[in-house]
């Protein structure tokens, strides 16, 4: 019997506010243990929380960016459970009236992964295990989160990977989080079950907790899918439980039985007022959102004639797309700008982290100036490429490296003379070309380009050389 994977995600994203959700403590990552906390975020008796309005704003932005409906009224609830990293013995979260309802994340295939809701909540502290002892660091306690809860629409590991990558990309684009999984500012709980292909009935699910690596998410899902299938086919039953993933052994193991909502005894938090969001506020926030990557990619393809693969590279990070947009202002061909960025500038930006920041020595205005010189016919493509390399090395503008004599192409007589010299000076290349080696012509064209300092038109030079060889 063939089985299919059924998965849904609960994705926790740390919001990029300066202070925590219910107090004025800093949210800065790191710091000595228990130095970024106060009586409110460690839950001392008599303290009262005060909701950070920026958290609500960021939650609304996330909802709009994922096509959700913003609730006019939402409320904070207490999720009750005892654990050392939860100082109050409850977490302030949302269950009954979350901030955003519905929405979806669209994959490259066109499939839409539906979202159940997005809610805001506080993070817990962190347990540190050392030499057989366990310590608690409350610096992270009270850091604001959104939790994005998907429907069980994911049917493959590839869909899971793309779903997480798309969420990460969108949240970075709108500027509400850096989504650095290695710093746990984005982490996922994966709910997974299996069922026979063609069946509509959901199987018993397990939950793999606190995954903060996309590669580990994929490996854990693959292992858990195979484990559940093997268990069912051997006559066993899948137990609803919470699992941890061990990347060293590539296995999952049980942490505890899986709780349902009623196990947490949710009730309305009496210390926090109802959140009211007006339609006017939603529209004002919507107006501040940047173009999102999917829409921007489509625009590059449809309006600027950028190949889809290149458009995806240009829109992967917001800083790159904004650089590209500025460099394209007033140019004849956006494709030329794209070629320079992808072909040359990217070679100086080695890591994905560097591409996300995209702090390069050539400003978009400087690249724009270079492309306009090329557009006007004052310089040729080879000279433009060579000039860009010098610009990247120095941070200087194009005109620092291009003299008046470099501008404008070769006249016909000068081109003919250089082509004759190329043929006369490169007998072996001429002979190779005559013997059917097409690539040999490149050496002859290279001679012309070098001796013209890039002013010659390469295509015209190649045609003239072929004419001379006969």
Enumerate the language-model features and the residues they cover.
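Small-residue helix-packing motif on alpha-helices
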Residues: 160, 311, 337, 384, ...
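Extended, charged alpha-helical coiled-coil/arm scaffolds that mediate oligomerization and mechanical coupling
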Residues: 377-378
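Amphipathic alpha-helical segments in well-ordered regions
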Residues: 62, 224, 340, 344-348, ...
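Basic, nucleic-acid-interacting segments
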Residues: 1-291, 308, 329-333
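Extended, structured, electrostatic nucleic-acid-contact surfaces
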Residues: 294-301
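Short, amphipathic C-terminal "tail helix"
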Residues: 438-470
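Core structural elements
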Residues: 184-196, 301-325, 334-352, 362, ...
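Strongly charged, low-complexity linkers/loops
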Residues: 357-368, 372, 381-450
């Amino acid at each position: 019997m063939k089985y299919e994977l059924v998965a849904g995600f609960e994705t926790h994203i740390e919001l990029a506010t300066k202070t925590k959700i219910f107090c004025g403590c800093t949210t800065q990552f790191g710091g000595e243990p228990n130095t970024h906390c106060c009586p409110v975020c460690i839950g001392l008796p008599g303290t009262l929380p005060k909701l950070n309005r920026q958290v609500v704003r960021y939650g609304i932005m996330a909802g709009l960016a994922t096509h959700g409906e913003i609730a006019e009224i939402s409320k904070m609830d207490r999720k009750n459970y005892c654990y050392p990293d939860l100082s109050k013995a409850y977490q302030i979260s949302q269950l009954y009236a979350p901030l955003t309802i519905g929405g979806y994340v669209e994959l490259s295939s066109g499939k839409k992964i539906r979202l159940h809701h997005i809610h805001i909540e506080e993070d817990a502290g962190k347990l540190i295990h050392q030499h057989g002892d366990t310590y608690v660091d409350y610096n992270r306690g009270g850091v604001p989160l959104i939790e994005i809860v998907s429907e069980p629409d994911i049917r493959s590991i590839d869909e899971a990977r793309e779903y997480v990558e798309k969420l990460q990309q969108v949240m970075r684009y709108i500027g509400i989080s850096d989504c650095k999984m290695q710093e746990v500012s984005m982490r996922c709980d994966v709910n997974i079950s299996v069922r026979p292909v063609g069946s509509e009935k959901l199987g018993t699910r397990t939950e793999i907790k606190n995954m903060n690596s996309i590669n580990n998410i994929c490996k854990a899902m693959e292992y858990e899918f195979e484990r559940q299938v093997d268990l069912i086919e051997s006559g066993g039953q899948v137990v609803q439980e919470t699992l941890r993933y061990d990347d060293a052994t590539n296995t999952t193991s049980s942490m505890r039985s899986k709780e349902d909502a009623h196990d947490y005894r949710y009730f309305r938090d009496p210390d926090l007022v109802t959140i009211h969001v007006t339609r006017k506020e939603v529209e004002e926030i919507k107006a501040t959102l940047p173009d999102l990557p999917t829409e921007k990619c489509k625009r590059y393809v449809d309006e600027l004639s950028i190949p889809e693969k290149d458009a995806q590279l240009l829109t992967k990070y917001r800083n790159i797309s904004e650089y590209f947009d500025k460099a394209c202002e007033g140019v004849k061909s956006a494709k030329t700008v794209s070629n320079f960025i992808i072909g040359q500038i990217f070679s100086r930006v080695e890591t994905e982290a560097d591409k996300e920041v995209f702090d390069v020595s050539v400003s978009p205005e400087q690249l724009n100036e270079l492309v306009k010189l090329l557009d006007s016919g004052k310089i040729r493509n080879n000279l433009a490429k060579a000039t860009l390399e010098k610009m990247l090395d120095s941070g200087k503008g194009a005109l620092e490296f291009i003299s008046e004599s470099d501008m404008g192409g070769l006249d016909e007589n000068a081109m003919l003379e250089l082509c004759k010299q190329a043929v006369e000076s490169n007998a072996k290349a001429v002979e190779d070309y005559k013997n059917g080696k097409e690539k040999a012509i490149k050496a002859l064209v290279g001679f012309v380009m070098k001796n013209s300092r890039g002013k010659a038109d390469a295509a015209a030079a190649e045609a003239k050389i072929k004419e001379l060889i006969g």
